[in-house]
Amino acid sequence: MGIFSVSRSTDAKKLEALLVEGERIESIYKLRVDQICFTNKRIIFFDNKMFSKKKVRVFLPYKTIESFAIQEAGMFDPDTGLLLMTRSKTFELEFAKDTDLSEVQAVLTKHLCS
């Protein structure tokens, strides 16, 4: 799953340094500006805006996510996205054009409904 092969990706090797004991990378997807990593325990991504100088690495445990929404490409808006809603904040992530969001939805549903 994911657009990167977890075992071969240099991005995966960088992310492995951020993992805790017993945590493993399940999939990595390309975002419009960066990437998002789904592990067996949480989601890791940068919360940044394209023109902002600040990049904040976000570690979001699945248990903190209250709901999510998938934004599909439309006729006049080719971007696809994901909204992750927590009690305190909503994160809006824009994916690369060729990302299969049904895969992303399946990964999230697996973790949130179990």
UniProtKB/Swiss-Prot annotation:
InterPro entries the UniProt entry points to: PHb, PHb_sf
Protein's name according to its UniProt entry: Uncharacterized protein YozO
Name of the gene encoding the protein in the UniProt record: yozO
